[in-house]
Design a protein with these regions (language model features):
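Short aromatic/hydrophobic "clamp" motif used to bind/position activated sugar donors
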Residues: 98
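Short beta-strand/loop segment that forms part of the nucleotide-sugar
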Residues: 41-51, 72-75
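Acidic helix N-cap motif at the loop->helix transition within catalytic regions
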Residues: 26-28, 54-63
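Acceptor/aglycone-binding surface of glycosyltransferases and processive sugar-polymer synthases
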Residues: 76-78, 82-92, 106-190, 206-225
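Short, acidic, metal-binding catalytic loop of nucleotide-sugar glycosyltransferases
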Residues: 32-42
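Cell-envelope/extracellular polymer assembly enzymes that use nucleotide-activated donors
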Residues: 13-15, 44
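Hydrophobic helical membrane-anchoring modules
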Residues: 2-13, 186-327
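A conserved acidic beta->alpha catalytic loop
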Residues: 49-58, 105-106
Length: 327
């Protein structure tokens, strides 16, 4: 199906977009907290169930039946990934601003309202939540630092600027970013391509309420690869520089060995040293071929129109949005 649909005029001030994966134990409390918020201009909740294997679907249907604010539940046909699910939510959100939260309750909804007000006051297109203390496992924090380092290097991002999954964007930016239908979206890279009106705000980060994170090391590596190759040819240029450096080193070594041979001096190199050098150069060649293959593979998959997401069904509550005008 076509993922891009006509975007209606904003009917609420703020949309909360929450991607869900096996969130049956956490989503109810989070939704009730969001419903109780006082948002001038009204707010809505968009839940995107990204192929959960537990009872998330049934819990969402129950929340929809008792919704106190406008609510939309979207079902993906299978698990496509967090960034894919967020883009699906952005395409259906009707707010003038959109905040996306994690499904585990670690992003307090009250902090989302602070982030929204900060974006309004500063005239920002994108406002990231900067966690004072992150309540993730050590390997997740290490992975986040690696992602920050790679985006500093590969993307047009101010060095050291903090990126996080807790962000507030304008409807304008969400609409522009949601126009991307590629199968390997990386939201922060897309946002940096659209606008430079970006800021951050220090926010609280809670401990996970229940369950375990849906992010595995494999998923984190896939995210790294998307950040690494989707928005820059810098890795290929680095491979070229590395190849030139090794070629120069090889010619230099050849000159040294030839000089030693001519003088009849120098160490007696055997098969061990020869095989070690061969393995080093072969390993470098395979790494470069793998990098080129990653680019070509992603191009092949994109050309063959692998879907970014497939929507199985949508359910919307019939409660009208608040009529109070935004301040």
């Amino acid at each position: 199906m076509n993922l891009i649909e006509p975007t209606p005029a904003p009917s609420v001030a703020l949309s909360f977009v929450i991607p869900l994966y096996n969130s049956a134990d956490t989503i109810a409390d989070l939704v009730r907290t969001i419903e109780s918020l006082d948002v001038p201009g009204g707010h809505e909740i968009v839940l995107v169930n990204d192929g959960s294997r537990d009872t998330t679907r049934e819990v969402c249907r129950g929340l929809l039946a008792q919704a106190r604010v406008p609510m939309l539940v979207i079902e993906h046909a299978r698990n496509f990934g967090e960034h894919n699910a967020v883009l699906t939510g952005w395409r259906h959100a009707r707010g003038a601003h959109i905040v996306n939260l994690d499904d585990d309750g670690q992003n307090p909804p009250e902090e989302a309202v602070r982030l929204w007000r900060h974006a309004q006051e500063r005239g920002l297109d994108v406002a990231f939540g900067h966690y004072l203390v992150k309540q993730h496992a050590a390997w997740r924090n290490w992975g986040s630092r690696m992602t920050t380092w790679m985006t500093d290097w590969a993307l047009d991002k101010p060095k050291g600027f903090y990126l996080s999954s807790f962000r507030c964007v304008t409807a304008f930016v969400a609409r522009e970013v949601a126009g991307n239908t590629g199968p390997f979206p990386y939201l922060d890279g897309l946002l940096l391509q659209v606008t430079q009106r970006i800021g951050s705000l220090e926010v609280k980060h809670r401990e996970r309420q229940a369950g375990a994170s849906g992010y595995t090391f494999r998923r984190l590596v896939r995210l790294w690869m998307s950040a690494f190759v989707n928005f820059s040819v810098m890795p290929l240029r680095l491979a070229t520089v590395l190849g030139l450096f090794l070629a120069a080193a090889g010619f230099l070594a050849l000159g040294v060995v030839s000089y030693w041979w001519w003088r009849g001096t120098g160490p007696a190199f055997g098969w061990g040293s020869l095989m070690a050098a061969f393995l080093v150069f072969s390993g470098v060649q395979l790494v470069i071929l793998g990098l080129v293959g990653e680019y070509l593979g992603r191009m092949f998959i994109t050309i063959n129109q692998r879907p970014q997401a497939v929507i199985r069904e949508r359910f919307r509550s019939d409660r009208p949005p608040s009529s109070e005008p935004p301040r």
